[in-house]
C-alpha cells in the first residue's frame, strides 16, 4: 500500500469581522460521543478553554478507509488507517476524553426539559462551568484498558419505543 503522508495538509483560517473569540467552550457529551465529535473537542483544546459536560466520551481518536476486495468479491474492508491529533499533539484518548481535558463536568440529561433550558441538567452544568470555571461534579475517567461497549448494545428498546427512546437509548 502506498504511503499517503504526501496528502497531509494544514489549513489556517483567517479571523473574520464577525468572528467571536470564546473564552470557554462547553461540549455536551455522553458515552456514545465518538469519532468526529471527539476530534472537534480535542482540536479545540489547543486553542480555547474546553470542558466536556455529561459523561465521558467513547474514545475513538482514529479513522478508517474502505478498501474493496477483488472485482469479483462484493466484500469491503474498513480498516483503521489514521490517528488524529490536535495542534498540541494530544491524541491518545482511547478510553474517552475525560482524562485528557482539563475540565470534565458530570451531569445528567433532563429529558423533560427543552434543549437549552437552564432546567436541563446538562445545560445547567455547562452554564455553571462557563460562568465559574468550575465543575460541581467531576466525571471519573474510564479505567485504562477497560473494554467499552457500544451505547446501542447496552440499552434495550421497549416494544413500541417513543421518539426519545429511539434517539436516546437508555432514556426509558
Mark where each language-model region is.
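C-terminal "post-core" interaction segments
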Residues: 1-172
Amino acid at each position: 500500500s502506498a504511503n499517503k503522508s504526501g496528502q497531509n495538509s494544514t489549513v489556517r483560517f483567517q479571523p473574520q469581522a464577525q468572528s467571536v473569540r470564546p473564552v470557554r467552550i462547553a461540549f455536551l457529551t455522553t458515552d456514545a460521543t465518538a469519532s468526529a465529535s471527539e476530534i472537534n473537542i480535542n482540536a479545540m483544546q489547543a486553542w480555547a478553554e474546553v470542558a466536556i459536560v455529561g459523561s465521558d466520551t467513547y474514545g475513538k481518536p482514529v479513522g478508517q478507509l474502505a478498501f474493496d476486495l477483488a472485482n469479483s468479491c462484493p466484500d469491503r474492508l474498513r480498516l483503521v488507517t489514521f490517528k488524529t491529533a490536535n495542534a498540541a499533539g494530544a491524541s491518545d484518548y482511547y478510553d474517552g476524553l475525560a482524562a485528557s481535558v482539563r475540565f470534565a463536568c458530570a451531569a445528567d440529561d433532563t429529558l423533560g426539559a427543552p434543549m437549552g433550558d437552564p432546567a436541563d441538567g446538562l445545560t445547567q452544568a455547562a452554564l455553571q462551568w462557563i460562568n465559574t470555571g468550575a465543575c460541581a461534579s467531576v466525571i471519573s475517567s474510564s479505567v485504562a484498558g477497560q473494554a467499552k461497549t457500544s451505547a446501542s448494545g447496552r440499552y434495550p428498546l421497549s416494544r413500541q419505543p417513543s421518539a426519545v427512546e429511539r434517539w436516546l437509548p437508555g432514556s426509558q
